Design a protein with these regions (language model features):
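Class I SAM-dependent methyltransferase SAM/SAH-binding core
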Residues: 53, 59-108
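Short, glycine-/aromatic-enriched active-site segment of Class I SAM-dependent methyltransferases
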Residues: 153-175
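A short acidic, Gly/Pro-enriched loop at the edge of an enzyme's catalytic core
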Residues: 107-119
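Conserved catalytic loop of SAM-dependent methyltransferase domains
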Residues: 194-220
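Short alpha-helix
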Residues: 176-192
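C-terminal lobe and adjacent flexible extensions of AdoMet/dcAdoMet transferase-like proteins
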Residues: 224-272
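Conserved alpha-helix/loop element of class I SAM-dependent methyltransferases that forms part
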Residues: 31-48
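A short glycine-rich, Lys/Arg-flanked "PGG" loop and its adjoining helix->strand segment in the class I
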Residues: 132-147
Length: 272
């Protein structure tokens, strides 16, 4: 039992209802998926019956939470974690009527255009969303006027090379995908595809990150020491929410190009 885990928090009253042992058994990364889901949902205006894509859902804890708390229908989509295991977790939580596990790559999803009323991504968007072309692809799946929202680990200010000395030991090459809320806002705003409504950071987000990490990964001294040394100067949680602009024409999502082979001579014939 881990009943002493810091899950009972006034900042996240919905999350505090869930058994800490269940939360720990359902995590798939370094962040508390319920805290981030509750924080993001506060800016999303989710309603019962909405079709929602939970992109990069991990082990579907966020999907179960969103279904139970808001009554939306959730497509729990992830590449790294088994849809079959997620189905067991969903069934045990009693929400199989409204949470549907999907195994898919974020860059090759099996959904119809404009199928979703909203798209959420909890602590996974930097893995694929920094690509300049990705928002063009993702926006196809949400209805015009529908919201797209992301929340997860990020930066309070951009990091230049080399990283600050107090982060050097922890900072690996993959962490260059982390960005600030202002960076994400610019990344989306410039396309015209999304009208950004919210771009902010969680107050004391670094402290929540640190407290959670001390409980779930106490042996990860490198990350814990980096957070303690940083004190929120660079590290924390970021959130971005915007609506798809219906007036913007999206480029086609091209997966294959139909061609027909025509056999032709390889070399020029000698002049006679």
């Amino acid at each position: 039992m881990i009943s002493d885990m810091p899950l009972v928090c006034k900042r996240f009253p919905r999350s505090a209802k869930y058994n800490p042992d269940w939360v720990l058994a359902s995590i798939s990364g370094a962040a508390n998926p319920l805290w981030l889901s509750e924080w993001l949902a506060a800016a999303m205006e989710l309603q019962p019956g909405m079709r929602v894509l939970d992109l990069g859902c991990g082990r579907a804890a966020s999907s179960i939470f969103l279904r139970r708390e808001f009554g939306a229908e959730i497509w729990a989509t992830d590449l790294w974690f088994s849809a079959s295991e997620n189905m067991q977790r969903i069934r045990d939580a009693g929400v199989e009527d409204g949470v549907f596990p999907i195994h898919a790559n974020a860059r090759s999803m099996p959904f119809a255009a404009e199928f979703f009323d909203a798209i959420l991504c909890i602590d996974s968007f930097p893995y694929f969303g920094t690509d300049d072309l990705y928002l063009n692809y993702l926006a196809h799946f949400v209805k015009p006027g529908g919201r797209v929202g992301i929340a997860g680990a990020g930066l309070m200010q951009e990091v230049d090379a080399p990283p600050p000395e107090h982060l050097l030991e922890w900072w690996t090459q993959d962490l260059w995908c982390l960005h600030s809320a202002n960076w994400w806002r610019h990344h989306w705003d410039r396309t015209g595809i999304i009208d950004v409504e919210v771009g902010d950071t969680m107050p004391d987000g670094w402290q929540f990150w640190l407290d959670w990490h001390k409980k779930v990964a106490p042996d990860n001294h490198c990350e814990i020491e980096a957070l303690e040394a940083d004190q929120g100067r660079y590290l924390g949680y970021v959130r971005l929410v915007g609506r798809r602009q219906g007036s913007v024409k999206l480029p086609d999502n091209i997966e294959t190009v139909a061609t027909q082979y025509t056999k032709m001579p390889l070399l020029r014939t000698a002049a006679t």
